Design a protein with these regions (language model features):
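Hydrophobic, aromatic-rich transmembrane alpha-helices
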Residues: 20-23, 153, 323, 327-333, ...
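Transmembrane-helix motifs of polytopic, lipid-linked glycan transferases
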Residues: 22-26, 141-163, 353-357
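Membrane-interface helix-loop-helix junctions at transmembrane boundaries of multi-pass membrane enzymes
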Residues: 29-30, 162, 211-217, 356-377
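Transmembrane alpha-helix segments characteristic
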Residues: 44, 221-224, 367-388
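Extracytoplasmic catalytic/substrate-binding loops of multi-pass membrane glycan-assembly enzymes
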Residues: 58-76, 85-104, 114-126, 320, ...
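Juxtamembrane segments of multi-pass membrane glycosylation machinery
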Residues: 104-144, 331-336
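Short acidic/glycine- and proline-prone juxtamembrane loop motifs at membrane-interface regions
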Residues: 187-194
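Alpha-helical transmembrane segments and terminal signal-anchor/GPI-anchor hydrophobic tails
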Residues: 221-222, 226-347
Length: 430
């Protein structure tokens, strides 16, 4: 049963909304983004509205759209808040304690694993802190969450506007206005914090490599961001490491960046399939297979039939087309079951149309090609991982939202819009 909203909740909601809308115009990290106060406030309010809509969908269409998690997390955070009042010692230690001693060693496991359970426990702990100030109100927590996670898109914007300084409008639209990205990273779920971590890692590395300057603050933010990603979805760190190392090598041979990335990823691929023979604890193909088995074992309304993956090179090659199709092209029109899946299908169609336009009119123009290689290789490694392991369209749409900014922003910025618009104008005159 949902908590009844009273007048105090409304007053707190309005008060916090005004306070944080004011704060986004005062913090230096936001002020130095080249966005004016009106733009910052609009972006913040868009995130709040998306987060409220996310919660509303969870209430009225949660079972149909398979979005009950957000409210489950909220109720668990209320229990955690009560624990803070009744047993502060346990509250401050239960994130570290785990009942299965061997669970600390099961980094990739989906059962009796400290690391697998940490993603939920950590997120609930954060929400419980919000509850101290919101009195346990879900929608007030949305305001807090929007304020905190807005750092992620702003960090990505600051990187991309440095890469494409003459494309401010395109960077703004592609960073903040992609519907699925805005929706999934604004709701009370892990994606907002995950992108915060990924974006800050990208921000620190980009300006660190560019300036060849690594002050203590930058290194600290980088480490904390890695810990955040590790806590919420540990396999993302595994995907980040080869992308970051390749980027680092490319900074040493800047004119051979693409060759560096291709050769590096070929080596990573070989290690992925062979390192298990040196140490069976690093049987990465088996880990991916176990993740797929865990998803297949679940039931839901958006699952699709998939070819079962085996821990062999041949199986991964055979399943590659299915993997990229699942993660990049679904839902098809035939997959549409409700308004959210319809919206996802329309969005994918529009993005594919933009991709075709990009192929026909690509202007290049990035200040750092090696950074773009990093974006592409990391994003596609994430998409392949999703496609190999997940067979629920709803989860796929949510997970892939993290990859979108790394691909969509460069794509939008490198389309020759002047040429495209001139052709459309000529066509209209004819």
């Amino acid at each position: 049963m949902h908590k009844k909203i009273n007048c105090l909740d409304y007053l707190l909601f309005v008060g916090y909304l005004i306070l944080f809308a004011w704060l986004v115009t005062k913090l230096n990290f936001y002020k130095n983004s080249q966005l004016n106060n009106s733009q910052l406030i609009i972006i913040f309010l868009l995130k709040v509205m998306a987060g409220i809509f996310y919660g509303w969908v969870g209430v009225y269409y949660g079972n149909m759209a398979k979005m009950v998690d957000t409210w489950s997390y909220h109720y668990l955070s209320l229990q955690e808040f009560e624990l803070l009042k009744d047993n502060p010692k346990e509250y401050f230690t239960n994130l570290i304690y785990y009942p299965y001693a061997e669970g600390y060693l099961k980094f990739f496991s989906t059962e009796n694993s400290y690391w697998n359970d940490l993603k939920v426990n950590f997120f609930i702990k954060i929400l419980s802190i919000f509850n101290i100030f919101s009195l346990g109100n879900y929608y007030i927590n949305v305001i807090f969450y929007s304020f905190v996670t807005m750092v992620g898109p702003i960090a990505m914007y600051r990187v991309m506007i440095n890469v494409y300084p003459a494309k401010k409008l395109q960077v703004i639209l592609a960073t903040f206005m992609v519907p699925s990205f805005l929706y999934w990273t604004s709701g009370l779920h892990k994606e907002g914090l995950l992108f915060l971590g990924l974006a800050l890692i990208t921000y620190c590395l980009y300006f660190g490599f560019k300036q060849n300057h690594w002050p203590f603050k930058r290194i600290l933010v980088l480490i904390l961001s890695l810990i955040l990603v590790l806590a919420l979805r540990n396999f993302l760190v595994i995907l980040l490491l080869p992308a970051v190392f390749s980027w680092f090598l490319a900074t040493r041979w800047p004119k051979k960046g693409l060759v560096v990335f291709v050769v590096s990823y070929l080596i990573y691929g070989i290690l992925f399939f062979t390192i298990r023979y040196a140490d069976e604890r690093f049987d990465f193909p088996a880990v991916v297979v176990s993740k797929q088995e865990a998803f297949i074992a679940h039931s839901g309304g958006s699952e699709v039939d998939v070819r079962v993956l085996e821990p062999t090179l041949e199986s991964f090659i055979i399943n590659a087309p299915q993997a990229i199709s699942l993660s990049s092209l679904r839902p098809y029109p035939s997959d549409v079951r409700h308004i959210l899946s319809l919206a996802a299908a329309v969005e994918i169609f529009m993005l594919l149309l933009l991709f075709v336009i990009f192929l026909l009119t690509n202007t290049g123009g990035a200040n750092s090609k090696n950074f773009i290689y990093f974006c592409v290789f990391f994003a596609f490694s994430l998409l392949f991982t999703i496609g190999y392991t997940v067979n629920f369209i709803g989860a796929i749409v949510r997970y892939r939202s993290l990859a979108f900014p790394f691909l969509i922003i460069p794509m939008i910025c490198q389309i020759n819009w002047t040429k495209l618009l001139s052709r459309l104008t000529i066509s209209e005159k004819k």
